[in-house]
Amino acid sequence: MNKERFDVAIIGGGIVGLSLALNLLGVGARVVVIERGSLDDMAAATFDGRGSAVSAGSQLILNGTGLWGPLSASAEPILEIRVADGTSPLFLHYDHRDLGKGPLGWIVENAHIRRTLAQEVKKRGLPVLEKVPLSAAHFYPSYVSLDLDDGRSVEARLAVAADGRHSAVREMAGIDAVSWSYPQTGIVCAVEHEVSHQGVAHEHFLSSGPFAILPMTKNRSSIVWTERNEFAAKIIKLDDATFAEELHSRFGSFL
């Protein structure tokens, strides 16, 4: 059986895997992505409340490879960061003007990142073996051979495991992982507010865990609410009005 050969094979076509693949493709590397899901599903992604912070350094990389242009319309600049311990009126204050001309970073909806990456993959002709899981990986001194569930096989000088925290590639490579569980749950949502957030990100370290308010486009904020498991389970089941009351007790009335 003839095997396709590449410089880099990236297993996992999520945000990390596709971003790396497009960057490597831009510098002339022969790259293939192996993804058990579908690019069409990524291209049809809708807002699920989650956003990602893009640092100034990451923005430079994305800009250099032409990815920042299509992302920028949905990117909200972070101009200030305010960090407080509990309900203390005192806070640490970071201002972009103290560090340089540009923002401290940006918040971008995950759904928009996924759609943009899927579109750029098709536009640039990046090879993606989709809708097929990896069945085996064979590691040699100078290359790796990857077998797919549908009988295909590829070889690459380098394999990148971008298939998540329960990485099958990591396990196939015999790389151990140490993990533990915190008795906490992350509740993520987005809110619209009347007062402009002015590009300010807030983070409060409460006894139950961090509570973050991150600026988004269209005068919205992404909420990352960490809560104890037993209480979080009750919060998630609340109706919208009662949930809003619980959120307001932590959010406050400044927005």
Task: Please identify what each model-predicted range represents.
Residues 3-5, 74-172, 180-185, 240:
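Conserved N-terminal helical subregion
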Residues 172-175, 185-214, 254:
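Flavin-dependent oxidoreductases
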Residues 16, 39, 166:
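Conserved Rossmann-like nucleotide-cofactor binding loop
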Residues 23, 116, 120, 190:
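Rossmann-fold NAD(P)-dependent oxidoreductase module
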Residues 46-86:
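N-terminal FAD cofactor-binding segment of flavoenzymes
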